[in-house]
């Protein structure tokens, strides 16, 4: 059985980067009228520059992938594969999952299986999930077992995003718990926890180190003392120099607090669809945890 995996452009995967993995672009909309496909018609550098030129906020939003792009992709690859596994970003952030389900539901046959799995994920940790599922499909793993692995992954991931301000997040409507504490966040770094597939404004910090302390305090409260970090990801919307400085702070924090890693920190690019909501000078830490160690 040959399997295609289809994810979307928020997964930090470039087209052609992983064999048999295909990327469906979300849409980026500027000024309510100019529409671009994430990673195809517009990229991170262009959106970064636009955000930099509009420090008070840019009228930019995102939308579902075009259904026409989905159908075109399926038509292009349908004869090459027997099974199609879709791993879109969290349905708590986007209607992409529901759109794909409606589009491919009529296509499944005994000879062509179409499977859409809810990931509760985004960005580099969604890429990790794609890599894990790819390894399974390479061994002809049954669909039921793949779905179980996806469910286990959802229970083992956590992402925290620290942003410069809430300008773009407010414009994009991608965050809850905002009204009660917005007035207190004028001069601090808001911290957003992405947990169970949704964003929640969970704290604030004056420094990057303080943000890290809050992040790992939450991880400990959620997962307990007996866990190990299997993978850690660092995504950012900084200049290269600042990105290097913040990554060094993260490493120093982990070392000082005797938090051991099974791998080095993995850095990944942010897509235009994500920076449209975070704004510039934001970073995220994604963790894949082994809770049983």
Curated annotation (Swiss-Prot):
Q: Which InterPro entries match?
A: DegV, DegV_C, DegV_domain_contain
Ranges for domain DegV come to: 3-289
Summarize where hexadecanoate binds, as residue positions.
62, 94
Q: Which GO terms describe its molecular function?
A: lipid binding
Q: Name one Pfam family in it.
A: DegV
Key words of the record: Lipid-binding
The record describes the protein's role as: May bind long-chain fatty acids, such as palmitate, and may play a role in lipid transport or fatty acid metabolism.
The entry's protein name is DegV domain-containing protein MG326 homolog
- Species per Swiss-Prot/TrEMBL record: Mycoplasma pneumoniae (strain ATCC 29342 / M129 / Subtype 1) (Mycoplasmoides pneumoniae)
């Amino acid at each position: 059985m040959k399997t295609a995996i289809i994810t979307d452009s928020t997964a930090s995967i470039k087209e052609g980067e992983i064999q048999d993995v295909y990327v469906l672009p979300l849409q980026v909309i500027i000024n309510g009228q100019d529409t671009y496909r994430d990673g195809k018609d517009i990229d991170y550098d262009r959106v970064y520059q636009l955000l930099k030129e509009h420090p008070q906020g840019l009228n930019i939003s995102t939308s579902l992938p075009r259904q026409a792009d989905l159908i075109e992709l399926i038509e292009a690859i349908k004869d090459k594969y027997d099974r199609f596994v879709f791993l879109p970003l969290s349905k708590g952030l986007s209607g992409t999952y529901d759109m794909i389900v409606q589009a491919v539901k009529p296509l499944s046959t005994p000879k062509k299986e179409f499977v859409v799995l809810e990931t509760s994920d985004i960005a580099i940790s969604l890429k990790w999930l794609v890599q894990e599922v790819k390894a399974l499909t390479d061994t002809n793993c049954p669909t039921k077992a793949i779905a179980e692995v996806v469910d286990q992954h959802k229970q083992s991931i956590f992402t925290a995003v620290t942003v410069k301000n809430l300008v773009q997040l407010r414009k994009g409507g991608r965050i809850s718990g905002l009204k009660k504490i917005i007035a207190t966040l004028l001069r601090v770094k808001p911290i957003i926890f992405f947990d169970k597939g949704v964003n929640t404004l969970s704290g604030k910090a004056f420094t990057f180190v303080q943000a890290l302390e809050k992040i790992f305090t939450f991880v400990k409260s959620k997962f307990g003392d007996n866990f190990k970090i299997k993978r850690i990801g660092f995504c950012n919307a900084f200049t290269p120099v600042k990105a290097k400085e913040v990554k060094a702070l993260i490493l120093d924090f982990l070392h000082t607090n005797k938090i051991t890693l099974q791998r080095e920190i993995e850095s990944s690019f942010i897509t235009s669809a994500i920076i449209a909501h975070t704004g510039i000078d934001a970073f995220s830490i994604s963790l894949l945890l082994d809770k049983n160690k």
